[in-house]
Amino acid sequence: MIRVDVHIPKWDYEVSCFFAVTEYWVDDIMEELFYLQIDSENARRAYDNLNSGELDTGLCFANPRQRKAIIVVAKASSAAEFINSVSHENHHLASYVAKQFDLDPTGEEVAYFAGELMKEQFPYIKHLMCDCCRKKVYHERVHSEDSRFGIIGKEVLPYYE
């Protein structure tokens, strides 16, 4: 799993992003969701989604009063599916922000929010956006002599076929 904490200054919004998530991380992510005061129905749906082990899924939850949100993207079957899932969940958050601040959902302000979010996420997830890079990074980290298999700083690498 890769965690990226993003602050969008213009809206004073904090976003915790979790990428390449597996069932192993369900409890940690549910704890974060409860901190944001997720309601019981959405908590059950989130738990079921996270615990399913399905590829190419995700979720987004925001607490407008706290100006905080969580984006979760599961492991992906391909780089294209990963990009699709990230943009899908980022779009949900941009839509929530548009509603919260009474912005035109098709307007520039919402597009800038989505762009800032992706710009902050990109350095941490760029290697997941290319199938060749995904396999290369996995191979290098697993087979390096000083590898701590899977954990590099804040990164916990997902398994790739």
Where are these regions (language model features)?
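Short His-Asn-centered micro-motif
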Residues: V72-A76, Y96, G115
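Post-HExxH zinc-binding segment in Zn-dependent metallohydrolases
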Residues: D104-R134
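Long, well-structured alpha-helical subdomains associated
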Residues: Y124-E161
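Alpha-helical hydrophobic/aromatic positions enriched in membrane-embedded helices and signal peptides
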Residues: A80-N84, Q100
